[in-house]
């Protein structure tokens, strides 16, 4: 028989009393009523906040979006395959936030800021809310510095400034992503941090973009946020806000950032899916009533900071895909009304071999020449008008056989202007090269050449100017104006190169 020793028992009781902790921990919990299609209905969670993160028993995280009288609608940030009916859920008391740091540069991450490039964890000492309020009126200043895209058609006629929001819109396969990626490539050496957000894209397309950046050395200053087409709708909905939070981190550190959303219409579709499954009432095209707010609160975060905040900037280029050129659909009209202008890419121009296929007539930048250096204003001021007149004249000339000499000359000039706007992909031009190209076209130096010779002549002229007249580039970059000296140098170079070119062609 086991003897009971009173002293041992009293020691154990004494130890337990000493270890007793009077701290009371209140956890807001609930029970899963129903789960499926990335949505869970929870009973309980009485004091949960809208947008608060909740944690399921098996570790999945969700966001409480619908707070109803008898249950809470939660969207899952994962597949949630192990969640069972009746399992417990606890509120975390936190709103979605991500870690941020310089270490994110050169990495590919998902909407939760977790690396997906297989290169290990990313160290970060601070975090930022995924949804931060946009800067107010006082903390902004008007856009005045250019953000060079390296594309003549944009920088000369639809200029983009630092802190602007410019929509890139067009049908599928018209080169929208190419315009955006070329803009990122052109930021090399410009001290601009770039964030590329891929929402609902094919994984192969994202891999292709990342490979291009790596080959051209652009990943050094770029962060790629990717949620591919097979990701849960919740993560596709969050990805743009994650990208914006990362760009804001640099903007508030007095840096310049460029963020590309490719594309917000996929985000709207993911949000529509979530909203319909949460049984929110559908509106136009079955989108929920707050789909405008979805995009406006995202794009309003792009800004040019005031001098008191360090004059950092965040430039946003959302890309929206249209169906057979229909710009009047719901999402395109929403985004057009939020942004400061749009670059319209046309399938007809693309198929006609005009690439980038920018329709200059209906593209617009509401910031205008404020986002150009003086030299570009001087040279490119009339080119948009000339091209618009040429397009009108060309349409009219199709019905008329006998045209007078002046009209024929105007048509010839317009065709050459259109030719000089063509550019190969991933071949951005410096602002000095653009000024030289436009000046050559608008002043009639190309009129004597055949249309097929224009691009070859311009490429040779750029090389000749760089090697023989480097002072031209120095004048433009130092004074930012197209001085008489620069014009004289350029005229001499064009004449010398024209003689050399014509001799080569005759030989």
UniProtKB/Swiss-Prot annotation:
PROSITE patterns, per database record: ATPASE_ALPHA_BETA (PS00152)
GO molecular function: ADP binding; ATP binding; proton-transporting ATP synthase activity, rotational mechanism
SUPFAM superfamilies hit by this protein: C-terminal domain of alpha and beta subunits of F1 ATP synthase, N-terminal domain of alpha and beta subunits of F1 ATP synthase, P-loop containing nucleoside triphosphate hydrolases
Gene Ontology CC: one annotated term: chloroplast thylakoid membrane
Keyword Transport included in the entry's annotation: yes
GO biological process: proton motive force-driven ATP synthesis
InterPro entries: ATP_synth_asu-like_sf (IPR023366), ATP_synth_asu_C (IPR000793), ATP_synth_asu_C_sf (IPR038376), ATP_synth_F1_a_nt-bd_dom (IPR033732), ATP_synth_F1_asu (IPR005294), ATPase_a/bsu_AS (IPR020003), ATPase_F1/V1/A1_a/bsu_N (IPR004100), ATPase_F1/V1/A1_a/bsu_N_sf (IPR036121)
Quaternary structure (record): F-type ATPases have 2 components, CF(1) - the catalytic core - and CF(0) - the membrane proton channel. CF(1) has five subunits: alpha(3), beta(3), gamma(1), delta(1), epsilon(1). CF(0) has four main subunits: a, b, b' and c.
UniProt record similarity statement: Belongs to the ATPase alpha/beta chains family.
Protein name, UniProt field: ATP synthase subunit alpha, chloroplastic
Biological source species: Vitis vinifera
